[in-house]
Amino acid sequence: MRVGRTLASGLFGAALVLALAGSPASAADGVQRANVVGGSGPDSRACGLSDWNATACFEPYGEWFWLKDEDADGLPVAIKWWYSNPGYPSRSGVIYNDHGKAAGWTNVNKSFEENGQITYELCEFDVPTKSTDNCWGTGWSHT
């Protein structure tokens, strides 16, 4: 009887820990500041959106988002993205670059299930409110 109760209690505790623990990949979603990497950027085939203001790219191998500010106007730029894959929770987020044009390429590494789809837009970004504005274009890629 005591062994059964101890075993049941242990199983319940393990289930509770698993239920309350968020996955590492989803915990990093939301609004993220891109890292300055300098040097060469992504494979040009990965770049789905570009204009005078910024360039946005997604490399499916390794799941890297790349963002480059192309205008020295001091205004941050962002990638607004969505991930979908049947059988898995949808995810979304914003990656912003407030380092300026002189920083060159910036990036953020994500982790997605294979065979999903990434859709993304290029946007202006307001750092104090953590909000996007004037988004345009639609890039997409498979994971």
Regions found by a protein language model. Name each.
Residues A27-T143:
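Post-signal peptide N-terminal regions of Sec-secreted extracellular proteins
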Residues M1-A27:
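Secretory targeting and sorting signals
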